[in-house]
Structures are given as C-alpha cells and as structure tokens.
Amino acid sequence: ASAEGVLSLIPFGDHDDWLLSLPLFHVSGQGIMWRWLYAGARMTVRDKQPLEQMLAGCTHASLVPTQLWRLLVNRSSVSLKAVLLGGAAIPVELTEQAREQGIRCFCGYGLTEFASTVCAKEADGLADVGSPLPGREVKIVNDEVWLRAASMAEGYWRNGQRVPLVNDEGWYATRDRGEMHNGKLTIVGRLDNLFFSGGEGIQPEEVERVIAAHPAVLQVFIVPVADKEFGHRPVAVVEYDQQTVDLGEWVKDKLARFQQPVRWLTLPPELKNGGIKISRQALKEWVQRQD
C-alpha cells in the first residue's frame, strides 16, 4: 500500500534504478525497498562512498536538500531522473536548478506509523505538502492533523502488549498543526514546538520556511531560548552554502518583529552526524551551551 501510493505520483518503471541511500532501520529506507519490489525495477546497494559515485547508473534517489545542492553546484555527472526530497524546507531555487538538469523533485509528508509517505507532490515552492496519496485520508480537528490509511500500523508494542494507534474515532492524531486548502495539506508545525515570546506565538517551522528561501541557506532551525522579559526569544541555527550572510537584515521586511531571531548561529557538523533528521532537543541543548 505504501509503494502503490507513492508510485501513483512518481514514475518508476522496470528499467529504473533507485539508490538505497537511506538506512533500512529508518522507514524511508524501507520505503525504497518496497517501491523497488512493487515496481519490479532495480535497487542499487553500495558501500559508503562519495554520493556522486554511489549514484552511478541510478535514475532515482531519496535525498535531503543539502545533498542535491552539492550535486548541482559541483555539476556532478549523474543519470538521475527523479529525487524524493525530505528532512528540510525545500528552496524553489533548488528545484528549478534541478529541473534545468533534467531532474524532477518530489516532496511530501510521512510518518513511520504509516509506512512513510502520506501526502506528496512535485515540488513547486509552495508551502503545502501535496494531496493525500491513494489509500490515505486526512482531516483537521482543532488545528491537528488526523490520519488513517491502508498502510497504517496496527499499533505500538509496549510491555508485551499491542497498544492501538488510533483514537476512539478510528483516526491517528499526529500532534502536527495543519491546514487543508483545496485538497492540499499544509503542515504548520508540531504542536509541541510552538512557543511564546512576549505573548506572541511563534511556530518555528513557519519562520524556518521564510529564512530557508534565501539562496545562501541550506537548512535552518529556530530554537527558543529562555528570556526574563519575553519568556522566550527565537535563535536561528543555520547551515550556510559556502559562506555566511547577514540574514538579520534580510528578514526585517519578511518576518514580524517578534519572529525575527535575536541571535544567528552556524550549525555545527557534529549535530548533523549523518542522520536523516536533526534533533530539535539536541539543538536546544547545544544553543544553551553557547551562552
């Protein structure tokens, strides 16, 4: 069910080859394997080496935006036709450059509990994550995204017992804030990530999307730091493309005053640690140590 839904959007035929670029202990890595089996196509597995070498002969790959940026900047000779992007905001400049080199970019929204992708689309620079794929249902209840799908897990295994995934109404409540417009889902952010500064609510993901639009930004995270006067203030942790820029000046006419970071820090390599996602908790702890 997972593979069928994704491949209803992304062309992947029996002559195509998807690089196993993600670990199989992560649902996104398992998703590559399911799509390979469903399509009767090929899947390439290689020992760890530079990404350009790993992609030799591959038509499809699951990457994070930073990896695709580097391939494009280096004008790497690859045979890619399509890339499924995840893990960070996707700048429109990135997808446009990829399209110029014949690479279609897709993005979406998924969860481990749903065997990965729930909604997806061809990346277009807009904030939404696309429409529900076949076999998936989405609704918004009190600003929270609720889901159910054919690919949904039966539950969690805890203390020798299966704990149901769904609530009394038969839906999985995600704890994600979302909106539906014209059948397309927009993820505003995690309900757990919302914080207040001087009485104003700040959703980190909303601020991150604005900052990520700058061409020098590979990825950015907004972290709340305690403040005696305001309760919390936003700090930005940024991974730059080659060199730093004055983003504080750049965001002045793009973000409300209370949303503008009071401090800009560069993302340290140790927090990336080869993972698919960067831990917000680890970011908070690192920022606190910078004082």
Predicted regions and their residues:
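Residue-level signal for inorganic ion chemistry
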Residues: A61-V64, V83, G87, V138, ...
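Acidic/polar alpha-helix N-cap and adjacent early helical turns
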Residues: E285-D291
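Glycine-rich beta-strand-to-loop/alpha-helix junction loops that act as flexible
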Residues: L85-A88, Y109, R148-A150, G198-E200
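Gly/Ser/Thr-rich phosphate-binding loop
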Residues: H60-L63, L71-A127, E137-K139
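AMP-binding/adenylate-forming catalytic core of the ANL superfamily
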Residues: A149, R175-Q259, L271-G274, A282
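Conserved ATP/PPi-binding loop(s) of AMP-dependent carboxylate-activating enzymes
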Residues: S131-P134, V141-G170, E200-I202
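AMP-binding/adenylate-forming
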Residues: A1-N74, A82, F106
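Short, well-ordered beta-strand segments
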Residues: D17-L19, W146, V237
